[in-house]
Regions:
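Core subunits and conserved enzymes of cellular information-processing
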Residues: 1-215
Length: 215
C-alpha cells in the first residue's frame, strides 16, 4: 500500500473517531441538566418540547445548516461539501446511541464533573474533525460561511452562530413551554471553555496530526 493511501486511511479513521468523540461530548453535555452547548441548543429544545430523540433533532438541524450555507453562498456551494449530510447522519447516529446508554447523574458534583468531561471531549472531537481537513460538521461549516459573508474569520462566525443559537433556543423554549429549555450556566461555560480546549489541543497535536495524515 502506498504511503499516500495509508495517510488517507488514517485521515478517515481519525475523522470518524473525531465525530464519535464529538458526539459523546455533546451527549454528556445534555445529561448534566445544567444547559447544553450552543451547537445543539436549538435541536435539543425542539426535541425536549416535542418528544423527539435528540439525535434525530440534531440531524434535521444539521440539514437546515447545510441549506443555510447554500443560500448564503448563493449557489456557490462546492459539490463535495454535500458530504456534510453523511457527517450529519454519523454524528446524529452516535448521539442517539450514547443518549440511550448513558444515564443522567443526580448529584451536583457528578453533574459538574460530567460537564467538564463533556466540554473536553467536545473540544477534542471538534479539533480532530477540523484538523484532518476532510468535511466540517454543518455547524462549523455554517460558522465559517457566516464569517466569510461578514468579511470576518471563522472565529467571528462561530461567535455569531453561538449567540444566534442561544437567542433562538430561548425563543423556542418560551414559546413552547414558557421557560428556557436547555439553556443554563452549562451553556455559558461550554461557550467560553470549548474554544479554549480546541486551542490547547491544537497547540500540542495539530502539527502532528497534519504530519501523519496530510499527503
Amino acid at each position: 500500500m502506498q504511503e499516500k493511501q495509508k495517510k488517507w486511511i488514517l485521515r478517515i479513521a481519525l475523522y470518524l473517531i473525531g465525530i464519535m468523540v464529538l458526539a459523546l461530548g455533546i451527549t454528556l453535555n445534555t445529561k448534566t441538566n445544567l444547559g447544553v452547548s450552543p451547537i445543539i441548543s436549538m435541536p435539543y429544545a425542539v426535541a425536549q418540547i416535542f418528544g423527539y430523540e435528540t439525535g434525530t433533532a440534531v440531524f434535521v438541524a444539521y440539514l437546515i445548516f447545510i441549506v443555510l450555507q447554500i443560500v448564503l453562498l448563493k449557489g456557490k456551494f462546492p459539490s463535495f461539501q454535500f458530504l456534510q449530510v453523511a457527517a450529519s447522519y454519523l454524528t446524529s447516529a452516535f448521539i442517539t446511541i450514547f443518549d440511550r446508554i448513558i444515564p443522567t447523574p443526580d448529584q451536583m458534583g457528578m453533574r459538574l464533573l460530567v460537564l467538564a468531561l463533556a466540554i473536553i471531549l467536545t473540544g477534542i472531537g471538534a479539533a480532530v474533525t477540523v484538523d484532518v481537513n476532510i468535511i466540517p460538521n454543518p455547524a462549523d461549516g455554517l460558522a465559517r460561511v457566516l464569517g466569510e459573508r461578514c468579511g470576518k474569520n471563522m472565529g467571528f462566525g462561530k461567535n455569531l452562530f453561538d449567540f444566534s443559537a442561544i437567542v433562538i433556543s430561548l425563543a423556542i423554549g418560551f414559546v413552547g413551554t414558557g421557560r428556557p429549555v436547555g439553556i443554563g450556566i452549562g451553556t455559558v461555560i461550554a461557550m467560553v471553555c470549548t474554544g479554549r480546549v480546541i486551542a490547547a489541543f491544537n497547540h500540542f497535536t495539530k502539527k502532528k496530526i497534519e504530519e501523519i495524515t496530510i499527503a
